[in-house]
């Protein structure tokens, strides 16, 4: 595995460090809709581009969740972050679960926004064909976007999301990532993890629904929480940014509250 410092931007200067990982269809710009309203005094966010995306579009690699997790941990090392929380959207949810498995003692809290389970996401043959061909077929990407947001989003938004996806991802990497996040099962490596874990699901997302999270995320993490956002599909950063921020930051902030309680008990 070649060494790579993931391209990233830092936002905020708070004491609670957070690394946020994008999904299959976008680079770190996926988080642009929430940036203006984050609590940058309490948190410092590192938004990254995985290999094959954004500023790392031309980077070589195997384009697997394990490689992505190793890159995330290497970035934390480079930033000097011994302890940090993780956020991952969709495919990025699988990457951050891999990172938790690789460095469990370093992760404060983990958040999956419509996360792919650590068991992968087996697809029926027709859906697999739709997803696999999306690497070179913009119409397939648009169909996936439309289906996973309940068929309720305007054409202009769908078209813009497709353009962004095409511009900011390498087709070969895009296709290779699918094999990893959909086909690999590593849930035995995170099953029983004591790390507090939040899953955020969209009520309009038929693929990575609250029901699926109950059967996976909620079973594997003893300290799991699940929040379902109404009138929201797979892309909560675009569809419900303020609700997402409040949900995620309240969860992350509870880590400091828990530490305060522990300090009080020791006193």
Question: What are the functions of these language-model segments?
Answer:
Residues 223-267:
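Catalytic active-site module of serine/aspartate enzymes centered on a nucleophile-bearing elbow/loop
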Residues 67-83:
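Conserved acidic catalytic loop of the alpha/beta-hydrolase fold
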Residues 198-232:
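Conserved loop-alpha-helix segment in the C-terminal half of the alpha/beta-hydrolase fold
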């Amino acid at each position: 595995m070649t060494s790579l410092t993931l391209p990233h931007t830092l936002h905020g200067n708070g004491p609670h460090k957070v690394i946020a990982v994008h999904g299959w269809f976008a680079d770190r710009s996926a988080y642009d809709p929430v940036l203006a309203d984050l609590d940058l005094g309490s948190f410092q966010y590192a938004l990254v581009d995985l290999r094959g995306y954004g500023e790392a579009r031309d980077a070589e690699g195997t384009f697997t969740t394990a490689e992505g997790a190793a890159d995330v941990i290497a970035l934390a090392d480079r930033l000097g972050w011994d302890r940090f929380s993780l956020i991952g959207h969709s495919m990025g949810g699988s990457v951050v679960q891999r990172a938790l498995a690789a460095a469990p003692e370093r992760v404060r809290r983990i958040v999956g926004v419509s996360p792919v389970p650590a068991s992968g996401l087996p697809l029926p043959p027709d859906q697999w064909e739709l997803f696999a061909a999306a690497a070179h077929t913009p119409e397939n990407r648009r169909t996936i976007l439309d289906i996973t947001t309940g068929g309720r989003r305007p054409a202009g938004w769908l078209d813009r999301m497709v353009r962004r996806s095409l511009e900011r991802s390498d087709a070969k990497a895009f296709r290779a990532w699918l094999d990893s996040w959909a086909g690999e099962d590593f849930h035995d490596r995170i099953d029983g993890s004591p790390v507090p874990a939040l899953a955020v699901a969209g009520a309009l997302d038929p693929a990575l629904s609250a029901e699926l999270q109950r059967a996976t995320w909620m079973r594997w993490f003893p300290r799991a929480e699940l929040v379902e956002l109404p009138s929201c599909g797979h892309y909560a950063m675009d569809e419900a940014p303020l609700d997402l921020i409040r949900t995620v930051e309240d969860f992350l902030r509870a880590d400091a509250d828990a530490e305060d309680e522990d300090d009080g008990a020791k006193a």
